[in-house]
């Protein structure tokens, strides 16, 4: 450091307050989820860095405890912030920069995170130091431990000075980051599995996998996580927030990785090319599936795995190494062996997770947890518009369409708009007549798997859905929901024409036909039309002569249940 630059420096102790940003309750409410996520990352990282530098025990600040537990950090106002001093000497650069009241959140966080720290081990000589914004470097003075905190100041750091120090920085970082005898990949080793990490914070995060320690708990569903970033990502499932928006089409996503995959649908980029025929693919899994065609044609000469690797550039291979576990059945790749094992259960049909209440089995533990909520009645996912609760995030997302009216997928046959691609596929089977889900017992086929599962309960006698009020059991959840409205008196389905309310959506659909005059059910014999399917079935008995309703008293037969009910009154009147 030049003498003229040293003159404005002063020595003070570093406290947690120096690297902390605190918000009032009102300020915290104004932050969106991405801003809160950034705040948590900066605060926890700063605390971790200071704690590792201190070398002795100290009281954990309340704001850090709140952040680790997933609580709102403004609650710390009740006690007042408590800070600890590391007892380190801090060189304050002379600065004229001030923090204005109208500074944006991003500027505030970046300003705090730019207060960087640098160390160098004892007996290492390093006369100069180039401060990196937002980076942590180690520098120890020969006799005293110093922490240099840089401020954004044009007078202190003119452009010429930055350029001059730039080349020096590159040399020093290589030396400071990698002291003699210590390789960058083997600084911090896990005692359990001997995996190595380049810094202590990464090692601590990894060790939580062995200890099972999960400090970050969701307030909505009580699910716990070992890392704050995982909790933040999980909380999005409750709020339904989708902060990652595609600039091309406006579609929103909960994860940045989902947005990245989606963006490739807009570009013509197809970076995975088959060397055999030249065909290109946007995703590596697509290339693997395609290469199986060539592998079947010439299995001795062609190796799908090797070809996939050879067809990528050096940079692409570096990215592709992240997914090293390949499914031999379908060609999909996965980041971990556990993810591959979960996936392979789709092909093997293995379902190791069984419900203790009804005996139903699942391939994944998450599916079992979601299913168990049917028995417990737990509904952790709540709609922000109407307050209605749901057992899964997918059901909540389907419900939200009622409020937003968003329907993105149109049927080419009838023009009907649907909210999801999977719903569109099931709907299209109405037009094609396709029924891929077949019952192995009686051979009856269905358009969707959920209908088949409900049907199979007729053969097994299984009725897993029980009413807590009267104990009556049902084969499907929707039947239970409809039944429970008898006890509650709830009628959520209202006709917009006359205001009449109904307990079931099917009853509302039938009622609307009174206003529209629609009669979609036609008799194939005489051409007469009906508003309800049951009315057509009853009418067709006139042509077939079928009389399924028999009087237990006199044995007389009837076409309609209502006719049998009226007939019973004759016997009631005859009784003395």
Curated annotation (Swiss-Prot):
Annotated tissue distribution: Predominantly in the kidney.
Record-level GO cellular component terms: nucleus
Keyword terms, alphabetized: Activator, Developmental protein, DNA-binding, Isopeptide bond, Metal-binding, Nucleus, Repeat, Transcription, Transcription regulation, Ubl conjugation, Zinc, Zinc-finger
GO molecular function: DNA-binding transcription factor activity; DNA-binding transcription factor activity, RNA polymerase II-specific; RNA polymerase II cis-regulatory region sequence-specific DNA binding; zinc ion binding
Intervals of motif Nuclear localization signal: 170-189
Keyword Zinc attached: yes
Compartments reported by the entry: Nucleus
One GO term (biological process): nucleolus organization
InterPro entries: KRAB (IPR001909), KRAB_dom_sf (IPR036051), Znf_C2H2_sf (IPR036236), Znf_C2H2_type (IPR013087)
Claim: Zinc is one of the keywords in the record: yes
UniProt xrefs under Gene3D superfamilies: 6.10.140.140, Classic Zinc Finger
Gene it is expressed from: Znf354a
Pfam families: KRAB (PF01352), zf-C2H2 (PF00096)
Protein name: Zinc finger protein 354A
Family annotation (SUPFAM superfamilies): beta-beta-alpha zinc fingers (SSF57667), KRAB domain (Kruppel-associated box) (SSF109640)
Span of domain KRAB: 14-86
Family assignment from sequence similarity: Belongs to the krueppel C2H2-type zinc-finger protein family.
Positions bearing the Glycyl lysine isopeptide (Lys-Gly) (interchain with G-Cter in SUMO2) cross-link: 125, 159, 242
Summary of the function given for this chain in its UniProt record: It may play a role in renal development and may also be involved in the repair of the kidney after ischemia-reperfusion or folic acid administration.
Provenance organism: Rattus norvegicus
Zinc finger map (C2H2-type): 188-210, 216-238, 244-266, 272-294, 325-347, 353-375, 381-403, 409-431, 437-459, 465-487, 493-515, 521-543, 549-571
């Amino acid at each position: 450091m030049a003498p003229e630059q040293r003159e404005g420096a002063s020595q003070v102790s570093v406290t947690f307050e120096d690297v902390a940003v605190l918000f009032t309750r009102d300020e915290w409410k104004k932050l969106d989820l991405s801003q809160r996520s950034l705040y948590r990352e900066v605060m926890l990282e700063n605390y971790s860095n200071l704690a590792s530098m201190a070398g002795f025990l100290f009281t954990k600040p309340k704001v850090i405890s709140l952040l680790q537990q997933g609580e709102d950090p403004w609650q710390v106002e009740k006690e007042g912030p408590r800070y600890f001093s590391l007892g380190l000497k801090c060189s304050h650069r002379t600065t004229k920069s001030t923090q204005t009241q109208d500074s944006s959140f991003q500027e505030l966080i970046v300003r705090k995170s730019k207060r960087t720290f640098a160390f160098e081990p004892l007996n290492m000589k390093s006369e100069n130091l180039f401060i990196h914004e937002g980076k942590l470097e180690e520098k120890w003075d020969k006799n005293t431990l110093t922490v240099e905190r840089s401020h954004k100041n044009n007078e202190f750091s003119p452009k010429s000075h930055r350029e001059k120090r730039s080349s020096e920085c590159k040399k020093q970082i290589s030396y400071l980051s990698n002291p003699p005898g210590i390789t960058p990949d083997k600084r911090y080793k896990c005692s359990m599995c001997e995996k190595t990490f380049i810094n202590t914070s990464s090692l601590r995060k990894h060790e939580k996998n062995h200890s099972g320690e999960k400090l970050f708990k969701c307030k909505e569903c009580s699910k716990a996580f070992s890392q704050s970033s995982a909790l933040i990502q999980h909380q999005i499932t409750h709020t339904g927030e989708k902060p990652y928006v595609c600039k091309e089409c406006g579609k929103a996503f909960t994860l940045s990785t989902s947005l990245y995959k989606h963006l490739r649908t807009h570009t013509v980029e197809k970076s995975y090319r088959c060397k055999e025929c030249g065909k290109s693919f946007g995703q590596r899994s697509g290339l693997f599936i395609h290469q199986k065609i060539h592998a079947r044609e010439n299995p001795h000469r062609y190796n799908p795995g090797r070809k996939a690797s050879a067809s990528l550039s050096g940079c692409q291979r570096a990215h592709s190494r992240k997914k090293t576990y390949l499914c031999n059945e379908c060609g999909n790749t996965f980041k971990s062996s556990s993810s591959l094992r979960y996936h392979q259960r789709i092909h093997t049909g293995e379902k190791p997770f069984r419900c203790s209440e009804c005996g139903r089995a699942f391939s994944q533990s998450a599916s079992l947890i979601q299913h168990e909520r049917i028995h417990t009645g737990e509904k952790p996912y709540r709609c922000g518009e109407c307050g209605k609760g749901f057992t899964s995030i997918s059901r909540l997302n389907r419900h939200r369409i009622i409020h937003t009216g968003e329907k993105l997928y149109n049927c080419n046959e009838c023009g009907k708009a649907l909210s999801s691609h999977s719903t569109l596929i099931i709907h299209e089977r109405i037009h094609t007549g396709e029924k891929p889900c077949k019952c192995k017992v009686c051979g009856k086929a269905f358009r969707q798997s959920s209908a088949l599962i409900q049907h199979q309960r007729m053969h097994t006698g299984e009725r897993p859905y029980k009413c807590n009020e009267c104990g009556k059991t049902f084969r499907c959840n929707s039947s239970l929901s409809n039944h429970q409205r008898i006890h509650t008196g709830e009628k959520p389905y209202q006709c917009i024409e006359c205001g009449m309310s109904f307990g079931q959506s099917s009853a509302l659909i039938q009622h609307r036909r009174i206003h529209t005059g629609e009669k979609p059910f036609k008799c194939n014999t005489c051409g007469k039309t009906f508003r309800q399917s049951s009315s057509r079935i009853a009418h067709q008995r006139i042509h077939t002569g079928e009389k399924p309703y028999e009087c237990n008293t006199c044995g007389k037969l009837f076409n309609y249940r209502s006719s049998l009910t009226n007939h019973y009154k004759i016997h009631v009147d005859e009784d003395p």
